[in-house]
């Protein structure tokens, strides 16, 4: 079935080009089609071209559909929604559903009004129909590089819009008719199993829900971070290994019932699709089920065995029809890529196979996580067989019998806790390497070079691969350009300054969120991750940056320094610079406690200069780190002078212009998020500001930026950028040459359209 293989690879490259928007994939597709043409096999060429044309039409239609839905304005509407019990998730006082309705498949969010409502929703056991009203809008896109891309994630599930409920009129049980009754039962059993897992000891519950039904608890990442750090996450994603173990278990049981081989095959064909639904239907599980089921079907129909390669090819094409983004996600890349690798590789010892899997998968892992643990190979060699023969069976036994026999549950819990403790211990060993995130060209190049080395394992190609990785790491660690980047951290400030070759890397403020008291019933014991972890540190790692030389803190407000403790816990910082009078505040000292390596703390007054080219121009005397005491910094980057003002008020701005009458500023980080208490017109005019940056949160409760400030900027003809409308704002420069402005969100994005409609309605 060689034609299917060539067609499947062509369709995979086509999806990377048309759906994932990777131009290099178009070049590779052209080369691959030329290779097919050179085979001089008319049948293979025709099958490949027909598939390419068909899939091109499918991908183009999908792109048009989702782009159309993403461009629609928000609208209030009433909806009838059908919701399965296992599609409901509750977090604190909020709930989230995946529902089907008149608007198609949609993500639904809402607020719980009472503890009674929360308890009732937790007890829903069957498919329900919701009659509700809410606001339908496109799913919010990420606003910083490397941030979780919700639209792409939900698009892979066929979802393009979110419905925020404002009122629920009625919830009633949906009728069970036809084949939907069987599907409903499977979803109900999945939900019941997940609820049963919650009665088990904590570690056994986490393993059972993630390994058997594909549901990861909300605390999975925080309590089992070592699994991701050591590259073991693929073991906890339902995929080929789990399906093979399940088939072995089912065959063992069916043979014990004295069923014939043909009857066993028919039972498997019925049970595998059922498990696909029961296991959550993830792309990796779908591939494994299709790959396992196709040879059975082929043998029953033709009485001949089929090749594994044809099964893999059909599974990929079916997967691309179901989810055109399957090869753009880590799970799909590892599932399909490693499965193909196991099919094509010659027979070799298990340790050698593990080495090759690490080599081939490294570029994919770097794109997803930007880091790699040097011990991951050794740990995988130990854990993979242990997982198949001990951990998975123990989890299954504990999940099935643990609630009836407490002794079994406690024994399984003891084993899993000790295993997890060992993993946590190993993960803290030296060896975690932050290498950076390769772009599409680097990722494809490293992957293809690794595959070529597998095909021709010579010393020359080994050296070439090592050289390529060396060049990649050097390009990440020592970039030719520098940048001033205003990170979108919501209603707060955080500015990253990188000198060319990363000679100095500094951060001005960390951002932070205020936490308001909430009713006891809304407290689920989980603390949301700080933005400095999900946005700032994540982005630094993708740049290959492992430490910060200096962190400047403008003053003591939470939206400027609230995430300092998390930053110090996650990343080494050499020094922290604060305005004079702030270093001894209890609030600041508490934020220093999580640091693994305590930084040097320095207090600054106007006139002090620093190694990264910044100079302080405020405060003039020690204060209490209030808004009026803000540390104000200025420096020249790429032939433009920047000034960063924290939350300094108008009086402070005028004081700076009086103290430094010759000071001229090209780019001003506008004070206090655009509040009318800052941005004095006379001060801005004297400074000669040409561009202003608003670091402000969307829909913030303070009404920032104030209309008075916007009028001042318009009157002075100051070009304005806003993190609320354009996401991360970057000024990229090369040494002393003038740089260029870039915004993460392009002109005409959803946030700008929404703001434009709001302004029009207020006029």
Q: What is each model feature region?
A:
Residues 1-70, 181, 287, 441, ...:
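N-terminal leader/targeting segments
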Residues 342-435, 691:
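Alpha-helical transmembrane segments of multi-pass integral membrane proteins
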Residues 81, 331, 361, 576, ...:
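Residue-level signal for inorganic ion chemistry
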Residues 158-291, 296, 550-552, 641-644, ...:
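Aromatic-rich juxtamembrane segments at the membrane interface
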Residues 120-121, 126, 130-135, 146, ...:
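Non-globular, low-confidence helical/coil segments that flank catalytic cores
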Residues 30, 41-42, 163, 223-379, ...:
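Hydrophobic alpha-helical transmembrane segments in multi-pass membrane proteins
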Residues 55-234, 534-538, 547, 581-583, ...:
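Membrane-interface helix/helix-cap signal primarily in integral membrane proteins
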């Amino acid at each position: 079935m060689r034609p299917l293989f060539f067609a499947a690879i062509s369709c995979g490259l086509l999806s990377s080009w048309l759906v994932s928007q990777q131009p290099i994939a178009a070049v590779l597709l052209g080369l691959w089609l030329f290779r097919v043409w050179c085979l001089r096999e008319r049948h293979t060429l025709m099958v490949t071209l027909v598939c390419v044309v068909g899939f091109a039409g499918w991908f183009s239609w999908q792109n048009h559909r989702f782009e159309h839905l993403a461009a629609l304005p928000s609208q209030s509407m009433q909806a009838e929604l059908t919701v399965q019990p296992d599609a409901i998730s509750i977090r604190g006082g909020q709930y989230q559903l995946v529902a089907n309705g008149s608007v198609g498949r949609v993500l639904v969010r809402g607020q719980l009004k009472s503890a009674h409502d929360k308890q009732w929703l937790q007890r829903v056991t069957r498919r329900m129909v919701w009659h509700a009203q809410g606001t339908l809008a496109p799913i919010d896109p990420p606003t910083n590089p490397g941030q979780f891309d919700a639209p792409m994630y939900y698009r892979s599930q066929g979802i393009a819009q979110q419905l925020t409920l404002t009122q629920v009129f009625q919830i009633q049980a949906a009728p069970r008719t036809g084949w939907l009754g069987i599907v409903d039962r499977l979803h109900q059993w999945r939900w019941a199993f997940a609820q049963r897992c919650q009665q088990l000891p904590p570690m056994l519950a986490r393993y059972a829900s993630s390994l058997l039904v594909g549901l990861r608890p909300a605390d999975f990442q925080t309590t089992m971070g070592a699994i991701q750090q050591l590259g073991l996450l693929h073991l906890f994603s339902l995929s080929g290994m789990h399906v093979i173990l399940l088939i072995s278990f089912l065959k063992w049981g069916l043979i014990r019932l004295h069923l014939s081989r043909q009857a066993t095959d028919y039972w498997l064909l019925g049970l595998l699709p059922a498990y696909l639904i029961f296991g959550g239907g993830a792309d990796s599980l779908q591939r494994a089920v299709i790959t396992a089921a196709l040879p059975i079907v082929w043998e029953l129909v033709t009485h001949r065995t089929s090749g594994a390669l044809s099964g893999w090819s059909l599974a990929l094409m079916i997967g691309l029809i179901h989810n055109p983004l399957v090869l753009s996600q880590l799970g799909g890349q590892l599932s399909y890529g490693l499965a193909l690798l196991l099919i094509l590789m010659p027979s070799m010892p298990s340790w050698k196979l593990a080495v090759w899997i690490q080599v081939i998968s490294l570029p994919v892992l770097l794109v997803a996580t930007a880091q790699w643990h040097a011990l991951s190979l050794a740990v995988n060699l130990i854990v993979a067989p242990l997982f198949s023969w001990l951990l998975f069976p123990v989890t299954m036994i504990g999940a099935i019998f643990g609630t009836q026999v407490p002794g079994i549950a406690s024994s399984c819990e003891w084993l899993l806790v000790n295993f997890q403790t060992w993993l946590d211990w190993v993960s803290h060993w030296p060896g975690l390497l932050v290498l950076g995130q390769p772009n599409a060209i680097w990722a494809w190049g490293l992957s293809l070079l690794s595959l070529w080395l597998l095909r021709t394992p010579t010393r020359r190609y080994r050296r070439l691969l090592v050289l390529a990785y060396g060049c990649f790491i050097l390009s990440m660690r020592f970039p030719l350009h520098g940048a001033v980047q205003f990170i979108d951290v919501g209603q707060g400030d955080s500015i990253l300054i990188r000198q060319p070759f990363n000679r100095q890397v500094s951060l001005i403020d960390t951002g932070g969120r205020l936490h308001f008291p909430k009713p006891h019933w809304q407290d689920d014991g989980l603390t949301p991750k700080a933005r400095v972890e999900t946005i700032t540190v994540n982005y630094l790692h993708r740049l290959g940056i492992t430490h910060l030389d200096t962190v400047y803190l403008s003053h003591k407000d939470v939206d400027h320094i609230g995430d300092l403790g998390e930053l110090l816990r996650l990343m080494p910082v050499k020094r922290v610079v604060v305005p004079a009078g702030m270093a001894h505040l209890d609030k600041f000292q508490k934020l220093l406690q999580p640091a693994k390596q305590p930084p040097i703390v320095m207090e600054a007054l106007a006139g002090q200069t620093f190694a990264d080219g910044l100079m302080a121009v405020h405060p003039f005397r020690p204060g209490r780190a209030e808004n009026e005491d803000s540390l104000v910094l200025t420096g020249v980057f790429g032939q433009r002078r920047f000034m960063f003002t924290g939350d300094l008020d108008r009086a402070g701005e005028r004081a700076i212009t009086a103290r430094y009458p010759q000071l001229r500023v090209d780019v001003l980080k506008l004070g206090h998020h655009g509040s009318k208490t800052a941005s004095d017109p006379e001060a801005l005019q004297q400074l000669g500001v040409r561009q202003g940056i608003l670091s402000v949160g969307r829909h913030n409760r303070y009404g920032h930026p104030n209309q008075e400030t916007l009028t001042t900027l318009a009157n002075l003809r100051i070009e304005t950028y806003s993190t609320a409308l354009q996401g991360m704002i970057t000024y990229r420069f090369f040494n002393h040459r003038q740089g260029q402005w870039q915004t993460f969100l392009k002109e005409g994005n959803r946030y700008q359209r929404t703001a434009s409609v709001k302004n029009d309605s207020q006029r």
